[in-house]
């Protein structure tokens, strides 16, 4: 499994590789704009940043067009930070049920990037509990700086690219 932050970069790197190696799972881990939904459905197997109705509707539409089912994580803004993406906890239930019941998209878990304030465990625990309340099995949380803490809270996907490849320019 591999992750990419940007659709354009993924297209330039992975289009040919995935044709020759269809068993590779490609994860969209960055912010996904709704106008990139068509390309995202064609390229990716997982989307970790589902966070609004327009995006969900576009992704569902292109899944039907391309006859492809992706796996989704709803991105939760766990602390309602103004500068972070994600759906608020107060809207999570309605958004989740709309996605699975109306759009019939395969939401497999929640994703969050908590504040980097030394209290990440509190947020990881909260996300784990929300995930369980919705009956979901997968959790996408933990990055290079805090993935060890996230592992204590049943995370199944971590993003550790900067630990492996270094920081982006």
Language model segments and positions:
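Active-site-proximal glycine-rich helix-loop-beta segment
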Residues: 154, 161
């Amino acid at each position: 499994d591999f992750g990419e932050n940007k659709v354009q970069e993924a297209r330039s790197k992975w289009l040919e590789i995935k044709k020759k190696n269809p068993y590779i799972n490609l994860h969209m881990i960055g912010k996904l704009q709704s106008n990139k939904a068509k390309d995202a459905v064609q390229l990716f197997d997982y989307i970790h940043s589902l966070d609004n109705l327009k995006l969900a509707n576009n992704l569902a539409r292109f899944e039907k067009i391309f006859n492809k089912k992706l796996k989704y994580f709803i991105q939760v803004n766990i602390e309602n930070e103004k500068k972070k993406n994600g759906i608020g906890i107060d809207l999570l239930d309605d958004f989740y049920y709309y996605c699975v019941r109306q759009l019939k998209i395969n939401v497999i878990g929640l994703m969050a990037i908590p504040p980097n304030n030394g209290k990440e465990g509190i947020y990881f625990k909260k996300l784990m509990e929300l995930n369980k309340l919705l009956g979901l099995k997968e959790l996408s949380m933990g990055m290079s700086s805090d993935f060890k803490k996230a592992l204590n809270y049943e995370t199944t996907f971590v993003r550790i690219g900067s630990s492996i490849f270094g920081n982006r320019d």
